[in-house]
Regions:
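Short, flexible, mixed-charge glycine/proline-rich loop motifs
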Residues: 60-76, 114-121
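Short Asp/Glu-rich motifs
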Residues: 20-21, 96, 146
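Short, structured motif recognition centered on aromatic/hydrophobic residues
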Residues: 72-91, 122-126, 134
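Short recognition patches in nucleic-acid-associated and regulatory proteins
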Residues: 82-120, 140-141, 152
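Intrinsic disorder at enzyme termini
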Residues: 1-68
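Short, surface-exposed, charge-dense and proline/glycine-enriched linear segments
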Residues: 39-49, 116-128
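A broad, structural surface signal
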Residues: 3, 10-14, 78, 82, ...
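Short, compact, well-ordered microdomains
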Residues: 118-154
Length: 154
């Protein structure tokens, strides 16, 4: 990724928690520490995160499950089971959101004003329970959070 300039060394650390040494090699121990620190910083601090113990009935994405809890269907973090709301809701509204400059998504973007009028942003959505990255989106700064998944399960 870094060699192909898909992400810079800085973005690898900031976005993915991957530590790339000056010589281009990966620092596995440093990456483990960085990711643990990032996840700890992203969790909801008010203690209001409910963990679901119900059966996983669907794997929506690598990071998002649907669980049946007390007869109702909820989105949940695939890593820790944190409740991300009923399936009728936008799961992103139950995540911790961080909005970054668009260049954080890709170092090759350059000056966005050359291509579009409205300021774009790079949004990242984290599990409020464990801090794992759940989803990314690129949007205009004034756009509402994208509802990228609609589920109809019974």
């Amino acid at each position: 990724m870094v060699e192909g300039r898909a992400v810079s060394r800085e973005a690898a650390r900031e976005i993915y928690g991957v530590i790339v040494r000056e010589d281009g090699s990966l620092d596995a121990d440093g990456t483990k520490r960085e990711r643990a620190g990032q996840r700890a910083a992203r969790v909801r601090k008010d203690g209001s995160v409910k963990t679901l113990a119900g059966k996983v009935i669907a794997k929506v994405t690598e990071n998002l499950d649907v669980r049946k809890e007390n007869g109702s269907l909820h989105c949940a973090c695939a890593k820790c089971g944190a409740d991300l709301g009923p399936i009728r809701d936008n799961y992103k509204e139950h995540c911790v959101m961080e909005e970054r400059e668009i260049t954080a998504a890709n170092p090759n973007i350059g000056d966005w004003k050359r291509y579009i009028d409205d300021k774009p942003v790079f949004r990242q959505f984290y599990c409020p329970g464990c801090g794992a990255l759940v989803e990314n989106e690129v949007a205009r700064a004034d756009d509402p959070v994208l509802r990228d998944i609609e589920l109809q399960l019974h």
